[in-house]
Regions:
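N-terminal ligand-binding lobe of clamshell/alpha-beta domains
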Residues: 1-286
Length: 286
């Protein structure tokens, strides 16, 4: 079996299943997510946002696997070319478990999949149990895109609930700075697709005039590396740990990759152009 994964979530899943030997190529974002791939000398192909059919064909795959986010036109071109393609579109944690099992069935790694899923479920259950000791349930705004503002996906809402928070808004829906300001959430979490850990928190707060929000006043504003929340596979457990640390720091240990707002920098921010990533960078979301 020769597989071309078009998103890091697929590659990371194959790695967890110990089936990286099935890869015939990968994207640059897969390589960033799993640097050890560099030793395999795999051909680098474009991802599911900008996929190149002929480029993929040259790797002679038995199967191309794509996942969210993707551009319909790119996947349609692959399908029309006759290349075998499997497209995954998970929304919930249950969907992610199903996708892991599906990938495992393709590469004959069912026992590894069940072990991985059990680990995910156990960690989520443990986090939920610890969060049950909370004295309050803070309202949490999670943002996966900054222009326009877009709420994080449904699986993130589930992670927020497991961490002891109340998810604000409709998962995956657009919103506005005014709507979020009116809701005045207790915690602000930013995890922009394709931005890694580079969301400019102080600039965002200043440009949206959110200084008065209680989350800002209390410094409950954080950036979570996007691969921890936007990659639908087992690595979401890191995102859960970040959310838990941000939502209930008295109950959960700090996370080394959780970046907190520095209020001292707010007054230093000079109004600039929109800092949000370009649409092209969305393809690195997993």
């Amino acid at each position: 079996m020769r597989i071309v994964p078009l998103q890091p979530s697929i590659t990371l899943t194959l790695a967890a299943l110990t089936r990286l030997d099935t890869l015939s190529a990968c994207t640059k974002y897969c390589l960033e997510a799993l640097p050890e791939l560099a030793t395999r000398n795999l051909q680098i192909v474009h991802d599911s946002w900008t996929a190149d059919t002929e480029e993929i064909r040259r790797t002679q795959p038995d199967l191309v696997i794509a996942s969210v986010p993707y551009r319909i036109e790119s996947l349609a071109a692959i399908l029309q070319s006759g290349l075998p393609i499997l497209t995954l579109a998970p929304h919930t944690l249950a969907d992610i478990y199903k996708d892991i099992r599906l990938i495992a069935a393709i590469v004959s790694a069912q026992p590894e999949a069940e072990s991985l899923i059990t680990q995910m479920q156990s960690t989520i259950k443990s986090t939920r149990h610890r969060s049950a000791q909370r004295s309050q349930t803070p309202v949490v705004y999670c943002e996966e895109w900054g222009n326009p503002l877009i709420h994080s996906q449904s699986w993130v809402a589930e992670l927020v609930e497991a961490a002891g928070g109340q998810y604000l808004g409709t998962p995956g829906a657009q919103t506005t700075p005014e709507a979020i300001a009116a809701a005045n959430p207790d915690v602000l979490l930013f995890s922009w697709c394709g931005a890694g850990n580079r969301v400019p928190l102080e600039r965002v707060i200043t440009q949206r005039n959110w200084h008065h929000l209680k989350a800002v006043q209390n410094r409950h504003v954080y950036c979570i590396p996007d691969q921890h929340l936007n990659t639908p596979t087992h690595t979401l457990l890191e995102g859960l740990a970040c959310i838990a640390a941000a939502t209930h720091p008295n109950l959960h240990p700090p996370h080394p990759e959780l970046i907190q707002l520095q209020k001292s920098k707010l007054n230093e921010v000079v109004e600039q152009s929109d800092p949000d990533p370009s649409p092209a960078s969305a393809s690195s979301a997993k």
